[in-house]
């Protein structure tokens, strides 16, 4: 929601040294004093904001709840030549692999065993949570897709035509205006409950 903010305080250990980012409420005795925390989302979703690069742009909302039963999610790409939505990138080096598998989001079967089944992996709390799906890469249709395509042998200039970087460095409204890049659709079916 645009009127909500998200901030965190956390500790982590690196090289045997413990670091703290922000302040914990439990460390304070005076509850009327402000806490210093790390902002992850503010009310202004603008690329010029300092936290823009920290935002989770690999998260897509499906609905209020999503149940594993009958969950099927795929990524489709609209072909420039036919206008048809394809489950693969139409380049020789990668056309035998579905987009969802190329993006690393189809590694498991329906029983969460290592064997892709052609659909987005449903792992409660990890890839699917609170009606949202989480792709494994921060920019699945941007720089991460470019890196994956080039690693599979797609020439750099050719890979660039499939990349939608504007989805990650512009607002959603601005990115939707770029019809020549807005060619990906999440399609599928799921059951939800309230």
Segments predicted by a language model, with ranges:
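Surface-exposed, low-hydrophobicity segments enriched in Gly/Pro/acidic/Ser residues
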Residues: 1-194
């Amino acid at each position: 929601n645009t009127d909500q903010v998200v901030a965190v305080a956390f500790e982590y250990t690196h090289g045997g040294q413990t670091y703290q980012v922000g302040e914990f409420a439990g460390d304070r005795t005076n509850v009327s004093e402000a806490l210093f925390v790390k902002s992850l989302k503010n009310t202004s979703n603008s690329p010029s904001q300092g936290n823009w690069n920290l935002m989770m742009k690999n998260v897509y909302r499906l609905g209020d709840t999503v149940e594993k039963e009958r969950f099927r999610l795929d990524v489709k790409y609209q072909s420039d030549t036919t206008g048809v939505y394809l489950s693969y990138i139409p380049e020789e080096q990668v056309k035998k692999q579905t987009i969802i598998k190329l993006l690393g989001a189809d590694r498991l079967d329906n029983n969460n065993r290592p064997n892709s089944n052609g659909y987005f992996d449903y792992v409660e709390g990890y890839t699917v949570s609170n009606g949202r799906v989480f792709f494994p890469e921060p920019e699945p249709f941007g720089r991460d897709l470019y890196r994956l395509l080039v690693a599979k042998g797609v020439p750099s200039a050719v890979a660039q035509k499939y990349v939608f970087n504007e989805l990650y460095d512009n607002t959603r409204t601005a990115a939707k205006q770029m019809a020549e890049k807005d060619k990906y659709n999440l399609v599928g079916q799921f059951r939800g409950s309230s």
